[in-house]
Every structure is written in structure tokens, then in C-alpha cells.
Amino acid sequence: MTAQLIDGNALAKQLRTEAAQRAAALTARGHQPGLAVILVGDDPASQVYVRNKIKACEDNGFLSIFDRYPADLTEADLLGRIDALNRDPRIHGILVQLPLPKHIDSHKVLEAIAPEKDVDGFHVANAGALMTGAPLFRPCTPYGCMKMLESIDYPVRGARAVVVGASNIVGKPMAMLLLQAGATVTICNSKTRDLAAHTREADIVVAAVGRRNIITADMVKPGAVVIDVGMNRDDAGKLCGDVDFAGVRDVAGHITPVPGGVGPMTITMLLINTLEAAERAAEDAALAA
């Protein structure tokens, strides 16, 4: 068996085309979707991520504001800028690129973003809403993973899903979205005993640890869907995920590649979250008129 690839680039292109059409309709009504991205410091990976986000906005008819600050920016100044963006009617989404310098409290910064503009879905109000099944925003990476499952018409209801990784950014919200879709979900973490015993029983495996080859072929149930969220480098410096792609591909039914899998979907769902925020703002403006 050779797994079918879930092509994140192709799916992202389709969803971005739809988002661009919705953005154009909003812009025609005077409500162009707007995203503000804040980068503090000069982390090379962060610069690449931010550049890709800004380009995605520009390519799809979104207003984008890029605020770049030196690493010695004070926490107070950053909070002041976020407050200004919270009050800016042109901006519907605010994203602070992580990680932040050590002297800045990331939690305090993320909580300063107005929940209705928290397009990453990290604010405690949005995380809590996700728990209740009525999220204002779904975190971008898990949201993209769910769209990938949807794209192959996978019957999530009743499936056994294992999420490897328990971060607030991917693992926990991924588990919640799968649970809400009707899956029976297990979350594995660094303390999990016999990881393979869990993954071998799974119909869906989501790997989100940031450790190369943590999922190998002998750990995967034949025919399972394997979604690789990891972003690592192999010994030759080539981009790779958390999954031993060459081996697992011969066992799984569907698999996402790295690169070209979850990555493009994450930025796409950021656009969609921003678009949905703009649509809500337009509705509120119409009601207030």
C-alpha cells in the first residue's frame, strides 16, 4: 500500500481563491479585511513566516500592516501598539509573531489582543469558547488539519484519533476539534508510556511534537490517516516533519507531506479567520447604521 498524499498546496490554493472572492465582495462594500502583523526582533524563521503571511494578504486582496520592532522594544510599548490596533477599525485581525524576546511576557501580550481580533485563537476567551464548542476563532493549524480531513471526505465521527503533542497552539485545540467532530481522542505527550501502543490503534494520527521521526512505520495502523504538523531539519538540512515519511507512506492510507502539507494550510486559515472577523465587523456596522 502506498498512501495517498493530502496536498496542502492544492487545497490552500482552492481555499485562498474562495477567500479572495469573499474579500473582494467585502471591499466593494467598504470593509476590506485587514490584518496587522507584529514582529519583535530578528529571528530568521519568524521573518520567513511573517513574510509569507504578508504576501498571502497582498495576493488575496487583504489590507496588511507590518510592524517590525527591534529586540529591545519594551513590553509597555508593544502593549501600547496592540491597544492602538484594537481600536483601529481598518484592522480585523492582529497577530504577534512568536517567540518574543525573553523580557516580554508572551501571555500578557496575547491577552492584550481584543478577542474579536485574535485571529490566532490564542486569547483565553477564545480558547475557552473552543472548549464549549462555540469558538469565535479556531487556531489556524488545527483548523487547517480539519480542513484536510474534510477534503478527503474522511469519516471522523466514530474514528479513533491520537494527537501526539499537547501544546496550547496545536495539540490541545486539535484534540478539541476532533472531539467536536465525533472522534474518540487520545492526547499523548512526553510522559506517555509506550507511544506506539496508542498510535497503532489510531485511525487518525496527528504528529505535532517538533521531533524528527517520532512516528515510524511500525507505529502506524495500516490505512490510517497521518497528519504531520512537525517542522524540522534532517542531517542534510532538508525540511522534514515529525513522521518518517518514506516508511510511513507505505503503511498509511493518507499522509501529509512536509513541506507542502500543513504549512500552506496554516496561513490559509489565518486568512479565513481574518475574513470571518471582517465579515462580523461589517454585519455589526450594518446593524448599527
Swiss-Prot record:
Write down any Gene Ontology CC term. Answer: cytosol
Q: Name one GO biological process term.
A: purine nucleotide biosynthetic process
UniProt: NADP(+) binding residues: G165, A166, S167, S190
Q: What is its EC number?
A: 1.5.1.5, 3.5.4.9
Q: Does the keyword ATP-binding apply?
A: no
Show the catalytic activity: (6R)-5,10-methylene-5,6,7,8-tetrahydrofolate + NADP(+) = (6R)-5,10-methenyltetrahydrofolate + NADPH; (6R)-5,10-methenyltetrahydrofolate + H2O = (6R)-10-formyltetrahydrofolate + H(+)
Q: What InterPro entries has UniProt attached to this entry?
A: Aminoacid_DH-like_N_sf, NAD(P)-bd_dom_sf, THF_DH/CycHdrlase, THF_DH/CycHdrlase_cat_dom, THF_DH/CycHdrlase_CS, THF_DH/CycHdrlase_NAD-bd_dom
Alphabetically list the UniProt keywords: Amino-acid biosynthesis, Histidine biosynthesis, Hydrolase, Methionine biosynthesis, Multifunctional enzyme, NADP, One-carbon metabolism, Oxidoreductase, Purine biosynthesis
Which molecular-function annotation in GO is an example for this chain? Answer: methenyltetrahydrofolate cyclohydrolase activity
Pathway-wise, it operates in: One-carbon metabolism; tetrahydrofolate interconversion
Pfam families, per the entry: THF_DHG_CYH, THF_DHG_CYH_C
Q: How does it assemble?
A: Homodimer.
Give the record's family classification: Belongs to the tetrahydrofolate dehydrogenase/cyclohydrolase family.
Task performed by this protein: Catalyzes the oxidation of 5,10-methylenetetrahydrofolate to 5,10-methenyltetrahydrofolate and then the hydrolysis of 5,10-methenyltetrahydrofolate to 10-formyltetrahydrofolate.
State what protein this is by name.
Bifunctional protein FolD
Q: What is the lineage of its organism?
A: Bacteria, Pseudomonadati, Pseudomonadota, Betaproteobacteria, Burkholderiales
